[in-house]
Every structure is written in C-alpha cells, then in structure tokens.
Amino acid sequence: MLLGSVPQLDRVAVQLGPFPVYWYGIIIGTGVLLGLWLATREGERLGIPKDTFVDLVLIAVPIAILFARMYYVIFEWEYYAQNPSQIINIRQGGLAIHGGLIGAVITGILFAKRRGVSFWKLADIAAPSILLGQAIGRWGNFMNQEAHGDEVTRQFLEGLHLPDFIINQMYIEGVYYHPTFLYESLWNFVGVILLLALRKVNLRRGELFFTYLIWYSVGRFFVEGLRTDSLMLGPLRIAQVMSIGLVVISIIFIIVRRKMGQADKRYSEN
C-alpha cells in the first residue's frame, strides 16, 4: 500500500474471510518456534528430555502474553478505561516485554518445581532462546510501525545504509522516525551470539540467565531513551527503570549466590 508517495509494507499477511492475519503474530510465533528449537537442542545435550521445553513453552507462552498485555494495559490505563473492548485486542501489538518476562519467570519457577528439575538450569538453557525470540519479535513492531524513535530525515536513515524497505516503513504519517526496533533487534542478535559463546565458558548455574538479563537491559535502557511511545510513570520511562533494576538485581544475585554457596554447580553439570 502507499502512504503519500512512499511504498510501505502491509501489516496484514493474509485475509482469511473476515479475519485478517497480521505479520505481528506470525513474526512473534516464528521467534517462539526458533527459540524452542534452540532450547530443546541444547536441553537434550544436557540431559533434559525434549518434551520438557515443549511443555514449558505451551504453558509459559500464553501466560507470558497475558502478563505482557496486563503490564501494557496497566500503564496505559487512561486509554483502556475509556476503551475496555480494546483490552483483549493484541493483534496489532501492545505487548510489553518486561511484563512477559515476569510471567515467564513465574511460570518457569512453578514448572521446574513440579517437574523436579533446577529452575536455574532451565533458565540458563532458555536464555539464548528468549533473547532470540526478542530479536525476531521486534520485527513485528517494524511491520506495525510502532516502537519507533524520534523524528529524523530520510537522509539520516540513508546515511545508516539501511535498505529501502526499512526506510520506507519508518515513514509514518508524513514523517521519518528512528528505527529503534532495528537497534534493539541487532543488539539482541549480538547478545544471542555472546550467550552461545559463554556456554563454552561453563559459568556457574544461573549466571548465563543473569548475563542475559544484564545484556538485554543495558541495550533496552539506551534504546528506550530514543523512543516516543514509552510507557510512563510520571516523568519516568518504565522500561528504563525496569532495566536498571534488572541489572542491579542480577549483579546482586550473582554475588550473593556465590558467597552463600548456592552457585557451586556449573552450567553443564547435571
């Protein structure tokens, strides 16, 4: 379709009768499946049955989506209080990663306890998968033309040597914007490579997951500063506050668990 004279991508992938299927959902689903493949592959290498992560994903993903939506709605309550019918409409976006992460961690803890396996072992194995899903998922924001940054010129975007389809999609209502989705996606892809490399270092159990939290949070903090659609609490950007909190908590957990002897096992130990 066209917006002005700039060709753009349609956020609807296919129309099934009266029901549109959005790229957003397809991309999120692709991220989940690729992350699951990565986790089951590593899990089998470390003695975790393949169906463990399949079962976990079947439970955790719906709960994570629920928490992600609840988190988003809470901080946009002024709008949703006036439009309650839109609370359950997630086909075009409106999912907060930090909310989803909270839901996933709670589910993971309960799941691990019920299965009699170490939560930290599952979390370490899943860490690269989660970050991979986030890296891919940001392209859903791209298709929806959301989660972008401040206004820029086309010349600025061309100076980044971006392909035309990205530049054109960043043209929204007559204005070009920072492709913050791309910055975060690239940061996350680099993080996946880092986490896969750190597997070979054989960190203490739980520390690969904390490394994921630190890496993601550092990148998110800086990218969030460029965004124009941040969830706010007064003058504070919620994602930046959460990012700082996760970095601090992760470092404290690493130090305390080591001092208390709760991190004696290594990543690859059973």
UniProtKB/Swiss-Prot annotation:
It is a multi-pass membrane protein. It is found in: Cell membrane. Its EC number is 2.5.1.145. A 1,2-diacyl-sn-glycero-3-phospho-(1'-sn-glycerol) binds at residue 138. It comes from the Bacteria. GO terms for molecular function: phosphatidylglycerol-prolipoprotein diacylglyceryl transferase activity. The chain crosses the membrane at residues 19-39, 56-76, 92-112, 116-136, 178-198, 206-226, 236-256. The keyword Transmembrane applies. One of its GO terms (cellular component) is plasma membrane. Keywords: Cell membrane, Membrane, Transferase, Transmembrane, Transmembrane helix. InterPro entries: Lgt. One of its GO terms (biological process) is lipoprotein biosynthetic process. Pathway: Protein modification; lipoprotein biosynthesis (diacylglyceryl transfer). Signal peptide: none annotated. Belongs to the Lgt family. Catalyzes the transfer of the diacylglyceryl group from phosphatidylglycerol to the sulfhydryl group of the N-terminal cysteine of a prolipoprotein, the first step in the formation of mature lipoproteins. This is Phosphatidylglycerol--prolipoprotein diacylglyceryl transferase. It comes from Bacillus cereus (strain G9842).
